[in-house]
């Protein structure tokens, strides 16, 4: 991938990881006091299972199981515990689930610049600018409660908040 053509700077990329917008969450820094309060509220309102439709290696689910002692299920486009699913197209509906996820991130522009747009073009047909927006739309249609790690650019995005 070209970083700076003028300066001759290039870097190798993992095109599979880039094309799926994968960024794995391995620490609990996202589990802030307001998030904990929201999770406890969701559990008190009937959420009984944690669902991560973009599970990756499952670190979010492991943390939720340990901290809140609830069962979990995860899906991933590359498979998670044998559960394969393209959740940018459809998230399986699970009764009483709360979605807790770090959705994929990849802008339309970045996909073109990194030459992986052909892998993800179908997701941008809905008119969103970033895969995380596609993911959020799917999450909000699939569960009553959703906790999603999103980039700061979300605040200024055109996504309907």
Predicted regions and their residues:
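Short, hydrophobic beta-strand segments that form beta-sheet elements in well-ordered domains
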Residues: 51-53, 69-76, 148
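Conserved glycine-rich SAM-binding loop
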Residues: 56
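Conserved Class I SAM-dependent methyltransferase catalytic core
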Residues: 127-161
């Amino acid at each position: 991938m070209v970083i700076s053509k003028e300066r001759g700077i290039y870097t190798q990329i993992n095109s599979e990881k880039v094309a799926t917008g994968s960024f794995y969450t391995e620490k609990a820094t996202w589990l802030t006091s307001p998030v904990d309060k929201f999770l406890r509220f969701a559990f008190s309102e009937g959420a009984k299972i944690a669902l991560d439709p973009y599970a990756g290696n499952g670190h979010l689910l492991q943390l939720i199981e340990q901290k809140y002692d609830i069962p979990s299920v995860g899906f991933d486009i590359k498979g998670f515990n044998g559960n394969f699913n393209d959740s940018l197209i459809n998230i399986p509906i699970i009764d009483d689930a709360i979605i807790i996820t770090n959705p994929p991130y990849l802008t339309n522009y970045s996909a073109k610049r990194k030459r992986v747009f052909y892998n993800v073009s179908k997701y941008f047909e809905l008119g969103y600018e970033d895969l995380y927006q596609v993911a959020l739309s799917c999450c909000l249609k699939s569960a009553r409660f959703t906790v999603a790690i999103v980039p700061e650019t979300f605040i200024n995005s055109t996504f309907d908040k």
